[in-house]
UniProtKB/Swiss-Prot annotation:
Function recorded in the entry: Component of the telomerase ribonucleoprotein (RNP) complex that is essential for the replication of chromosome termini. Is a component of the double-stranded telomeric DNA-binding TRF1 complex that is involved in the regulation of telomere length by cis-inhibition of telomerase. Also acts as a single-stranded telomeric DNA-binding protein and thus may act as a downstream effector of the TRF1 complex and may transduce information about telomere maintenance and/or length to the telomere terminus. Binds to at least two telomeric single-stranded 5'-TTAGGG-3' repeats (G-strand).
Single GO molecular function: single-stranded telomeric DNA binding
One Gene Ontology term from the biological process aspect of the record: telomere maintenance via telomerase
InterPro entries the record matches: NA-bd_OB-fold, POT1, POT1_C_insert, POT1PC, Telomer_end-bd_POT1/Cdc13
Keyword Transit peptide: no
Protein name: Protection of telomeres protein 1
Gene Ontology, cellular component aspect: chromosome, telomeric region; nuclear telomere cap complex; nucleoplasm
Presence of keyword DNA-binding: yes
Keywords, ordered alphabetically: Chromosome, DNA-binding, Nucleus, Telomere
């Protein structure tokens, strides 16, 4: 039977393996050697879903770990046919896997996954045999697990990390950003670790599932990461997620129970590792200062940033860019607090409880990227809100005292974010015990000495004419910084000297250009010039002119690239030459390949960009290939054409690309390519003129933005019909055609004024900055 399941009795397989088989070490698995009568044994640490190949054959891949080798201690095993189907039903992480009759082949993914340079190929047709020693049903980490089944992992100290490796490690959290939604669909968390070597490692972790990221609650927590890929950047080692990434997190307090917070349902944790956690705790207590700026509401002061552990008792939508959280921690703020006016129908939470706690709760206004998570929170849950800002605001009315506002600003700087704490968290258990002892009687009957009540508890919008009222009106744009600045009316802006910066609130009366594709320009940051984006006909004209020159055969198939030439049937036998850049004298997969093309049309080049990493149009000269005129793109990648500035560029020899090809893992980033070729790259930018009004004045402000305002890359808008439609819908929302001025949405913007000299005249211009369209506008 090709696949056999063996029971483990007293740490050994119930059935003995055939006597002619001898165990092979991982380090001896090489192509060209005879592995007949040999078997390899390892622990299953990762398995992939069963799939079918193009011909319908079942395919199953697993990763085995061998603890006899310390540096690269894992290898891929590829199974085909019925053997793949059978193993996919039986195998679980932690099983002992024994394979004989395997074929050893080079692994094309070794550089990417950091595993063995070879992989094992297994199938029933080739006479392979598999023995699986299944582990008992999965138990919690604290229960006994057979030592013969539990894999023994090797952990790398932070001062021994090497570029390109995939490692397991332990570390103490020195800084972290709570998970947030990245520009794509994944969640992202940033963690900076340190260990006894005093070396720091910053890890950027991505996952589509929030629960699969480390459950870190505060600085000083201890983490165990499995399968972190190490990359060197600017001389510093950095960690990123790789396939099979998993984590455990522990409270870093000396003497606290060693209870892991796991990112996966199945994991191993042995006594030896408990000792590692305790050693890290003791070292951190003596050598690190990792306590965060935690505070209770009774300790807050104006103009401070702090972390708050609290319970959520109410929440409400405020406008397109902010969300209200009503929280308490059982203590009383010593200052009057701002109560955000919201409509009763918008407020979620127990009305009776909210009324009882009205003098103990504070209103935290959450902005921008934190809004989505805030909306999903359940009332009654326990939170840790990181980097809350307390701001003192003066009342407009003499009968009302100044008050404190609580803000969680947008962005993730300084670890801003919201963490949801489980009920068994020690800090939550302590808070719950404290809240149960809080006497509400005094709070209920006391006149609001410490709280600024703008109307009744569940009143509608206040009638006060103040910025607090105006902020409730839907704003179609979001401020990405400087939220502390107060609004300035346009009349004051227009009557003030330049240069200055302002926060304004206005409506978009009109904008130019009306044809939105005309707003995309090319900008040189060095000489600060703008130019139009060349159209396809202009580029084709340049390419056709170069195609008239025959390729130079002496420049084909050099040491660092391989060339292919063919002749077209049309265009009088036009010759096309493609030069494939090699890496370590080998051709790469298409998705990793840079190629250069001579004699191709724009249509042909676009076809190549769909399959290959990037394409550079070139032409032959006597002794070298060279770039085309910079009126044409010097590089095409995906749907984007990259241009260079004619004025600021000093084109260098195309041979300089070979220096990038010699890198361990060439990234072929456009900025790197431009640098070695002596090109000053032009950047795609939106340039528009907005006419803004607020009832006190009319102001023309220019939008000069690469991608932040529309949250659309200017580089992609011309080739992506979906993004074009999104931009058009956005502008129709900001300035709906045919609508009265009173019906237009408000825009909150930052603008800066600057002087421009025109001969003897000095004119003041205005530019929008640090502003973006609200997420729910389109």
């Amino acid at each position: 039977m090709p696949v056999q399941v063996l029971k483990i009795i007293k740490g050994k397989p119930e059935t003995q393996l055939p006597s002619h088989l001898q165990r092979e070490d991982l380090k001896h698995l090489q192509t060209g050697l005879d592995h007949t009568n040999k078997y390899f044994q390892g622990i299953v640490i990762l398995s992939y879903p069963l799939t079918k190949l193009g011909d319908g054959t079942d395919f199953f891949k697993i990763v085995l770990q061998d603890d006899t080798c310390s540096r690269i201690n894992s290898i891929n095993v590829l199974m085909y046919g019925k053997m793949a189907e059978d193993c996919a039903k039986l195998i679980r992480n932690g099983d002992t896997f024994i394979v004989a009759g395997f074929k050893v082949a080079e692994s094309p993914t070794a550089r990417e996954d950091g595993r063995h340079a070879c992989h094992l190929q297994v199938s029933e047709e080739s006479g392979s045999a598999i023995f699986i020693c299944t582990q008992p049903s999965i138990t919690p980490f604290s229960e006994a697990t057979s030592p013969s089944v539990a894999p023994k992992y090797v952990y790398t100290p932070l001062n021994c990390l090497k570029d390109g490796t995939v490692v397991n490690l332990y570390g103490i959290v020195k800084f972290f950003k709570p998970p947030y939604i990245s520009k794509g669909t994944d969640y992202c968390s940033v963690v900076t670790l340190v260990d006894q070597s005093n070396v720091k490692l910053t890890c950027t972790l991505f996952n589509g599932n929030l629960d699969s990221l480390p459950k870190i609650y505060k600085n000083g927590d201890i983490v165990r990461f499995h399968r972190v890929k190490i990359r060197e950047y600017n001389g510093q080692m950095q960690g990123i997620t790789s396939a099979g990434f998993a984590s455990l997190t522990f409270d870093g307090t000396v003497g606290a129970p060693v209870v892991p917070r796991a990112s996966s349902k199945v994991y191993t944790f042995v006594d030896e590792e408990q000792k590692t956690v305790e050693e890290l705790r003791i070292w951190a207590a003596s050598n690190l200062s990792v306590s965060g700026p935690e505070a209770k509401l009774s300790d807050v002061k104006p103009m401070m940033f702090f972390d708050l552990t609290c319970q959520l008792v109410g929440k409400a939508k405020v406008d397109g860019s902010s969300f209200l959280l009503k929280v308490w921690d059982g203590t009383k703020c010593p200052y009057p607090t701002w109560k955000v006016p919201v409509e009763a129908k918008e407020l979620e939470g127990d009305r009776v409880l909210l009324h009882h706690l009205r003098n103990l709760t504070v209103d935290v206004l959450v902005y921008d990227n934190h809004v989505q998570l805030a909306k999903s929170l359940k009332t009654g849950s326990f939170l840790r809100i990181y980097s809350i800002h307390t701001k003192q605001a003066s009342a407009k009315n003499e009968d009302m005292s100044s008050h404190i506002e609580f803000h969680l600003h947008g962005g993730t700087c300084y670890g801003r974010g919201i963490g949801i704490l489980p009920e068994n968290n020690p800090d939550v258990e302590e808070l719950k015990s404290f809240l149960e002892c809080v006497e509400l009687t005094d709070s209920q009957n006391m006149e609001s000495v410490s709280s600024l009540e703008l109307g009744d508890t569940f009143d509608s919008y206040t009638d006060l004419e103040s910025p607090l009222q105006r902020c409730q009106q839907l704003s179609a744009t979001v401020l990405t910084d400087h939220q502390d600045m107060s609004n300035t009316v346009l009349k004051t802006v227009l009557n003030s000297s330049a240069p200055q910066q302002y926060r304004i609130r206005a409506k978009l009366r009109s904008f130019k250009p009306q044809k939105l594709y005309q707003s995309v320009k090319l900008h040189c940051s060095k000489c600060n010039t703008l130019q139009e984006v060349p159209n396809g006909d202009a580029i084709d004209f340049i390419l056709q002119g170069c195609a008239a020159t025959a390729p130079n055969p002496e420049l084909q198939s050099m040491s660092w690239y391989e060339s292919v030439v063919w002749t077209t049937e049309e265009d009088q036998g036009r010759k096309i030459t493609i030069h494939f850049v090699k890496h370590y004298e080998m051709l790469q997969r298409p998705e990793n390949t840079l190629l250069m093309i001579e004699g191709g049309t724009l249509k042909e080049i676009w076809k190549l960009t769909r399959r290959f990493k990037c394409v550079i149009p070139v032409k032959s000269k006597e002794d070298d290939l060279e770039l085309l005129d910079l009126s044409a793109p010097f590089l095409l990648q995906g749907n984007i054409k990259y241009y260079g500035c004619k004025k600021c560029s000093t084109p260098k020899s195309i041979k300089n690309l070979s220096s990038l090809a010699e890198k361990r893992e060439p990234s072929w980033e456009p900025t790197e390519i431009a640098q070695v070729l002596g090109i000053e790259p032009l950047q795609y930018v939106f340039v528009m003129k907005f006419t803004l009004v607020d009832g006190t004045g009319v102001l023309n402000a220019y939008l000069f933005d690469y991608e932040k305002f529309f949250q659309i890359p200017a580089s992609e808008i011309l080739t992506n019909s979906f993004l074009q439609q999104k931009m058009e819908m956005t502008m129709n929302t900001l300035s709906p055609p045919g609508r009265k001025l009173d019906d237009l949405p408000w825009l909150e913007c930052f603008i800066k004024s600057y002087n421009v000299a025109d001969g003897m005249k000095h004119q003041v211009y205005y530019q929008i900055f640090d502003t973006t369209v609200a997420e729910d506008v389109v």
